[in-house]
From Swiss-Prot:
GO terms for biological process: succinate metabolic process. GO terms for cellular component: cytoplasm. Pfam families: Sdh5. An FAD assembly protein, which accelerates covalent attachment of the cofactor into other proteins. Plays an essential role in the assembly of succinate dehydrogenase (SDH, respiratory complex II), an enzyme complex that is a component of both the tricarboxylic acid cycle and the electron transport chain, and which couples the oxidation of succinate to fumarate with the reduction of ubiquinone (coenzyme Q) to ubiquinol. Required for flavinylation (covalent attachment of FAD) of the flavoprotein subunit SdhA of SDH and other flavinylated proteins as well. This is FAD assembly factor SdhE. It is found in: Cytoplasm. The gene is sdhE. The keyword Cytoplasm applies. Its main location: cytoplasm. Keywords: Chaperone, Cytoplasm. Belongs to the SdhE FAD assembly factor family.
Length: 90
């Protein structure tokens, strides 16, 4: 169990992350928010870094990648997208 201070920091970080996941497109919100709630804590630190990088991408790119309209050329991001799609049921 995390000491109280670390636990509070982790909760604060998760709130910041949830806020950062808010998108301008509902189609993306229904992917990102449940993923953060259901699966983010299970990721390795490396995977968390990839996820944080993913949420800095532009909404049109994210939408095209998640909907399969375009291929994400960054293999780490593409793997995270596949993982997210396998975990979040919409």
């Amino acid at each position: 169990m995390l000491p109280l201070k670390q636990s509070e920091e982790a909760l604060k970080d998760k709130r910041r992350l949830r806020w950062a996941c808010r998108r301008g497109m509902l189609e993306l919100d229904v992917l990102f928010e449940p993923f953060v709630d259901q699966a983010y804590d299970e990721l390795s630190e490396e995977q968390k870094a990839v996820f944080r990088r993913l949420i800095t991408c532009d909404d049109p790119d994210l939408f095209a990648w998640f909907m399969g309209h375009q291929k994400c050329e960054d293999e780490e991001l593409a793997e995270m997208i596949r993982f997210m799609l396998s975990r979040v049921k919409v």
